[in-house]
Amino acid sequence: MSCSRRDLLKNSIKGLVAASLPLSAFKILSPSQVKASVGDSNVRWVFLMDIQKCVGCGFCVKACKTENEVPYDVGVTRTWVERYVVTKDHKTNIDTPMGGRDGYTTSKIHGEEIDPDSITKAFFVPKGCNHCKKPACVQVCPVGATYQTRDGVVLVDRSWCIGCGYCIMACPFGARFFHPIYKVAEKCTFCYHRITKGLKTACVQACPFGARQFGNLKDENDPVTNTIMTKRVGILKDEYGTEPQAFYIGLDERVR
């Protein structure tokens, strides 16, 4: 696609306004609800994150940037880790410097020192694209550059993306950004080039504590499927109706 055609398409598309809904924490799913979301394909790739195991080391973020050619020192990333620190005054402090790439080695959050004695709870939350069953980003893309595979992975065709930004605005999880080099929409792809060859995603492979897992929800013998069906799992921002396929163990009500 030439630059002139891209500019023409960008300027000709008007009137789209992203819906604004109030933030909420999460929804706990029953096994029957999870099974209802798997679709018709023989494969349904899903992520499982265990907050109780995440230590905020940032290895996953580093691995993702390296694997997927996201500039290392630019403040955008396909996956990130947030730190939540709750204090005695019931304040929840949240930060993710450089997406948590370098881990969390200071008690400062946004330049403010947090008194260790005031902390009542602290934890880390891995985030990224939720590869929703009903992705809002796919619905709003005016040229079909954002699409969903039969096995549930949401991808972006760089050769078709016109950089209008509608998908970035539509994503309720903040999982999309403009690639600083290619000038197109960018996001997690579940390392599709790896999983289609039987390999793990870069972030899962890099996680030293098993906080990130990846599996096929259609395979009853998959360890990830077994965990999702037998443990208390939740999803983020259920109120948007996108049916996220990223599941969490140990979600706190403060996570949004």
Task: Indicate residue ranges for each PLM-predicted region.
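Non-heme iron-sulfur electron-transfer modules
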Residues: I28-G39, E67-D117, Y147-I162, A175-T196, ...
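N-terminal secretory signal peptides and thylakoid transit peptides that target proteins
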Residues: M1-A19
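Short flanking/linker segments adjacent to small metal-binding domains or redox-active Cys/His motifs
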Residues: K108-H110, F123-N130, V138, F247-R256
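C-terminal segment of N-terminal export signals and the immediately downstream linker at the start
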Residues: S2, L23-A63, E239-G241, F247-Y248, ...
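Exposed loop/turn and edge beta-strand positions of beta-sandwich/beta-sheet ligand-binding modules
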Residues: V43, F123, R150
